A protein has these predicted regions:
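Conserved lysine of the Walker
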Residues: 76
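N-terminal pre-Walker A segment at the start of P-loop NTPase domains
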Residues: 34-56
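Hydrophobic anchor at the beta1->P-loop junction of P-loop NTPases
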Residues: 68
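Hydrophobic positions on the alpha1 helix immediately C-terminal to the Walker A/P-loop
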Residues: 79
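Phosphate-binding P-loop
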Residues: 56-63
């Protein structure tokens, strides 16, 4: 047996080294959602995000902002892009973004899943863009990807 045959997915497939906002075609979205790994730390971030997001759905809040910070290469953009798919209720090949989390057991906490499903089922306009490409400020000063979500 060869080592490459021990993996669930082909190891010689195209794997994006850097997640970019502009890669929104169905093939890329499907790969990102199916291969996204939710670590214990990310489980906490998903729980916090969707618990707070639910506050705006079921009630009123003036706390609307979210700050995502971390070192270069730590997965901020990837996390944000996955959040955008969930909030947009993105569908690829008949499968909703939330389904990747449920079926693949990426999130197992039923309360977090309930909050995620509520968010996915609540209509929202999600606009995801890289501020570098929309700004006249030199690239060295801008390293933000901003989603705009309107309920």
């Amino acid at each position: 047996m060869q080592i490459k045959n021990m993996f669930a997915k082909q190891i010689d497939r195209d794997i994006k080294g850097v997640i970019k906002v502009g890669q929104g075609d169905d093939a890329n979205v499907q790969q990102e959602l199916s291969e996204y790994v939710v670590t214990r730390e990310l489980q906490k971030h998903f729980a916090d995000f969707f618990a707070n997001y639910k506050t705006g759905i079921v009630g009123n809040t003036d706390k609307m902002g979210v700050w995502i910070s971390g070192f270069f290469g730590s997965g901020k953009s990837h996390f944000l892009k996955i959040l955008s798919y969930l909030l947009d209720n993105r569908e690829v090949d008949g499968k909703r973004a939330i389904d990747y989390f449920v079926e693949d057991k990426k999130i197992t906490d039923p309360y977090v899943l309930a909050d995620m499903k509520l968010a996915a089922d609540t209509p929202a306009d999600v606009i995801l863009f890289n501020i570098d490409s929309k700004s006249e400020i030199p690239v060295s000063y801008t390293h933000l990807t901003l989603p705009t979500i309107r309920l």
